[in-house]
Amino acid sequence: KIKMATLVSPGILVKERDLTNMVIGESSSDGAIAITAEKGPVEEVVTVSNEVELVEAFGKPNASTFEWFFTAASFLKYAATLRVVRINSGHVNAGVSGTPILVKNSEHWLANFSDGSANVGQWAARTPGTWGNNLKVWQCPSLTVYEQKLAANNRVNGALAEGVTAVVLDNVDENNYAVVVDDIISFTSDAAGATPLAGHEGVEYIVTAVNTGTNTLTVKQHNVFSTKGLAAVVANESYITRRWRWYEQFENAPGTSTSVSNKSGSGDEMHILITDEDGGISGVANTILEKFEGVSKASDAKTESGDNNNYIDVIYNQSSYVYW
């Protein structure tokens, strides 16, 4: 028998204890909370398991939402999951019609807006809140919009000096041959657009303004972080090739899908691109957020693998930012 030592004066007694039979398990507690948030579905339960998922679903905290956010975040520090519902606090979805609308969540969109009968504009932000004001949806519905040789229908009207930013055309809004803001143009010496003007090889210009009264475009060099004007002189009656703003982001111009071609149709494809116009989402203005290549305007169009390729359905199933 082993006797324990007895201390007759102040001192330290060391004892060993085997704790290997104790297992501390992870928390299995679940919680629920209703919050206000800058983004995210309204009146829909979203289950999150950490703060990263909370931010992805409902955005970062701000002056109006921080109390709710940090209450939820604090619970997640010791809980397994948290069910979060965003309160309907008067926000509406950003859209193109100018008429305020509220699309609470996907189920609400399917029941009230998916067939287009609500007639409230072509696009709406995926969830309510001012965050959607940053979004811009770009569409390229045809080969002509993607790229067009203006030929003799709309040429440069008057010689231009190197460095200038004002380009006068015969008619900037010529029917079927117009040039609009954000178009990309280049100058050639031939109507077919095959031969660039001397000094303009590999140089394109983005249109930043259009004056229909004077038929004048304001341009700057494309993909150059400055306001540089023309790289060289431009002769009177030079030819122009016009392209869609984001043409270089897609492999080819939209055409006809195999699905529609097999049914004797044509011209159903379109490209869609979504940008962070103001930089409020990504931190950098005009950042590309999403792009959808060769989606179809035909309601029954299919991809080569048999999936639905109608652009409304593709946007609904794949976009994180908008509804049609």
State where each predicted segment sits.
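E2/UBC-UEV (E2-variant) core
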Residues: 284-324
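Autoprocessing Asn-cyclization modules and mimics
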Residues: 109-124, 130-235
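Short, surface-exposed beta-strand/loop "edge" segments at domain boundaries and coil↔beta transitions
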Residues: 39-44, 54-55, 91-95, 128-135, ...
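Surface-exposed interaction regions enriched in Ser/Thr/Asp/Glu
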Residues: 227-247, 263-265, 271, 278
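Surface-exposed receptor/substrate recognition regions of extracellular proteins
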Residues: 27, 42-47, 202, 261-284
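N-terminal-proximal low-complexity accessory segments that begin disordered
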Residues: 2-97, 103-107, 117-131, 137-139
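Short amphipathic, basic-aromatic surface patches that mediate peripheral association
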Residues: 171-174, 246-262
